[in-house]
C-alpha cells in the first residue's frame, strides 16, 4: 500500500514536546486581589441593612426615629443591603 504524503506521523512528531520542554509563555497573575477594607465595608453594609430591617420589624413602633421614617425604613434597609450586594461584583 502506498504511503500518504500528507500528515505522515514522522513529520508531525515534535521532539521538544516529547522531551517535556514547555514552550508556553508564563502568565503573570495579578496578586493584589480586593483590599480588606472593601470586603469589610461590603459585608458591613449587607449586615447593617439586614439589622435595620429586623429592628424595624421587631421594635419599630418603640423607636421614635423608626416611627418618624415610617415606610422609608424599608427603602433604607433594602438600599443598604443592595449596595452591599452590588459591591460583590467588584470583589476579586
UniProtKB/Swiss-Prot annotation:
An annotated GO cellular component of this protein is: plasma membrane
Domain of life from the UniProt record:
Bacteria
User: What are the recorded Gene Ontology BP terms?
Assistant: cell division
- Compartments (UniProt record): Cell membrane
Q: Which pairs of Cys residues are joined through disulfide bonds in the record? A: none
- HAMAP family, alphabetically? CrgA
What name appears for this protein in its UniProt entry?
Cell division protein CrgA
Amino acid at each position: 500500500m502506498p504511503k500518504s504524503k500528507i500528515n505522515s506521523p514522522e513529520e508531525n512528531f515534535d521532539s521538544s514536546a516529547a522531551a517535556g520542554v514547555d514552550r508556553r509563555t508564563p502568565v503573570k497573575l495579578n496578586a493584589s486581589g480586593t483590599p480588606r477594607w472593601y470586603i469589610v465595608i461590603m459585608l458591613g453594609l449587607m449586615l447593617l441593612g439586614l439589622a435595620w430591617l429586623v429592628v424595624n420589624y421587631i421594635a419599630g413602633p418603640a423607636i421614635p426615629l423608626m416611627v418618624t421614617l415610617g415606610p422609608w425604613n424599608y427603602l433604607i434597609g433594602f438600599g443598604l443591603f443592595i449596595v452591599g450586594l452590588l459591591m460583590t461584583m467588584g470583589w476579586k
